[in-house]
Amino acid sequence: MPRSLKKGPFVDVKLMEKVKKALESGDKKPIKTWSRRSTIIPEFIGLTFAVHNGRKFIPVYVTENMIGHKLGEFAPTRTFKGHAGSEEKKKAKGK
């Protein structure tokens, strides 16, 4: 169930302060954040966020299409290495 419209989108207070500071100064450095749950709002367009994925910070450049999504959606937390299999199966699949 989506968030109520009367409440508005959730944005972490500390993150919003960092965004306002960056917009006032015109700074283009990535804004470091652990707040993956924050919703992307129109004020974020054109800014770069360094979103923490649990291990490192992933740079996310915000565009118009991202509005309404969460910052965490663009910084995957899991890596898929592939399933182990024998070489024979891989060769047979290729034929």
From Swiss-Prot:
Pfam families, sorted: Ribosomal_S19
Q: Which SUPFAM superfamilies does this UniProt record tie to the protein?
A: Ribosomal protein S19
Q: Which Gene Ontology cellular-component terms appear in the entry?
A: cytoplasm; small ribosomal subunit
Which cysteines bridge via disulfide bonds?
none
Q: Which UniProt keywords apply?
A: Ribonucleoprotein, Ribosomal protein, RNA-binding, rRNA-binding
Identify a single GO molecular function assigned to this protein: rRNA binding
Q: Transmembrane ranges?
A: none
Domain of life of the native organism:
Bacteria
Give the matching InterPro entries.
Ribosomal_uS19, Ribosomal_uS19_bac-type, Ribosomal_uS19_CS, Ribosomal_uS19_SF
Q: Which GO terms describe its biological process?
A: ribosomal small subunit assembly; translation
Task: Give the record's family classification.
Answer: Belongs to the universal ribosomal protein uS19 family.
> What function does the entry list?
Protein S19 forms a complex with S13 that binds strongly to the 16S ribosomal RNA.
What protein is this chain from?
Answer: Small ribosomal subunit protein uS19
Give the originating organism: Thermodesulfovibrio yellowstonii (strain ATCC 51303 / DSM 11347 / YP87)
Q: Report which gene this protein is encoded by.
A: rpsS
